[in-house]
């Protein structure tokens, strides 16, 4: 059956696209622990995707059968590149395309992309239209923020007029980054806007939600269709499980997950990806138990997967 946001059971829980974190390896770990309803890739630059020698860029679009349904998130400023990228993505088995209009990173915003598009609605509309034209009827969504400097519901209203299949809103402005609590008090007004302007657009809220149980409360309070969980999975790989008993892991369970992550990384990427970026995941698994800090320090000193395995095995045998 063709994927449709509207056919998903409510509330919908999605895994956020997070740069340098939610690659296919980590998504598969989450899928085996407690799967979300929808997965997103890391954001992929449209011009990079179309360039020759795009191996590193296309790695971002790698996924497995267990990561379904999966949405390809793309970003950039050139509308023709969005059109061509959408054509390419439509042949790759993805269930939808999401346009990043929310990343607050300074160098990207300076180029007028991602959150920079909040200040350029004409280009934002052109990009949405071109992506839709190239996508061969794949669902189109946008992930954005409440505004650039201040909360701007006119921006949300504008997006709701673009006939999107889904709109994911990080409930902070670009200026706020993640430095203040998310503005969940705005969600009800946004739901009312959606009901008035575009009743068929699915609304997903994002910001400060650690797990499904917190998300259920937010949905109850706001009337949103679903919740996107991001950093919560770094604290708890079982963030998408409603079973609270699964959120408390033993030391052996945590370290077994790390070993699984190492094995999967090696199997999927081999020599394609270097070892150092893998170290950012150590803190996810090596925390909250006696001598965790010392173990993490030793792991950070390793230079390859085999060395990391040796350190882990020594710790578990001690």
Where are these regions (language model features)?
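Flavin-dependent oxidoreductase catalytic cores
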Residues: 1-318
